[in-house]
Amino acid sequence: MKFGIEFVPSDPALKIAYYAKLSEQQGFDHVWITDHYNNRDVYSTLTVLALNTNSIKIGPGVTNSYTRNPAITASSIASIAEISGGRAVLGLGPGDKATFDAMGIAWKKPLATTKEAIQAIRDFISGKKVSMDGEMIKFAGAKLAFKAGNIPIYMGAQGPKMLELAGEIADGVLINASHPKDFEVAVEQIKKGAEKAGRDPSEVDVTAYACFSIDKDPVKAVNAAKVVVAFIVAGSPDLVLERHGIPVEAKSQIGAAIAKGDFGALMGGLVTPQMIEAFSICGTPDDCMKRIKDLEAIGVTQIVAGSPIGPAKEKAIKLIGKEIIAKM
């Protein structure tokens, strides 16, 4: 099992670099930095991380091909690979409609866009001149002036078609899920895609990009996770809620509380233990270890400790290192 950790660059880059270095010291394999227009720039942050770490792999988790042209993404991640001494990985997905609506960007044909973007980026970083007349991505003889070599590309994927595509073309897949029930479904779709492409499914790094909250006090861990879990519930398809026995109407209730900024309601009971169980890896080190082993048994090969990580971030990173990574 590999371990990754997610940081949101809402904090200054040097603070993120401190946490990344600490994560490296605790045995984490990957640091993933989110890419969103309202935070610090992902590639500027990754540059600071590259200069302040030695061995941990680093990359965006995840970027997209709507706000960033694939040629620009290729140039950016190739630069990170060069600065870091070959430690770059690229997480790329379809993005989310709400963000694109806020930015005035049309979200068209995410499956075709993601597939064509990955092909173009691979060609760019291998030094090829790219001529592409795709359904969504088009180039007319564009070429980078330097070659990066091999950079693993992970697809952010949720739905069945995206998961199948990841099995066909990606080195890894980043799945926003925490529960074995969701991975039973996801792993089968990834296998289907891999077999379609004539690949061994074991070539694909199946990653649980999870809401993670760890503390020796389970109540503190749960309370730290509630707001993140609320956003997950509010954005989950009805099918996923039903899979976990969560009433579909809870989505609108939680969505309304989020819209009003009523976080007291979320903390006070709207976010139920059932939701915490379904949408997070949460609790004491023993609780988290049990869930990780259950996910490993299904076929998950990397756990990403996503927001909030724990009620106290530095303490949580050390706890994961000492009580989970060291014992795996």
Swiss-Prot record:
Q: Which residues form a coiled coil?
A: none
Pfam families referenced in this protein's UniProt entry, alphabetically:
Bac_luciferase
Identify the GO cellular component terms for this protein.
cytoplasm
Q: What is its main location?
A: cytoplasm
**Domain of life, per the record?**
Archaea
Location in the cell reads: Cytoplasm
Official protein name in the record = 5,10-methylenetetrahydromethanopterin reductase
Question: In which organism is this protein found?
Answer: Methanosarcina barkeri (strain Fusaro / DSM 804)
Q: Cite the source lineage.
A: Archaea, Methanobacteriati, Methanobacteriota, Stenosarchaea group, Methanomicrobia
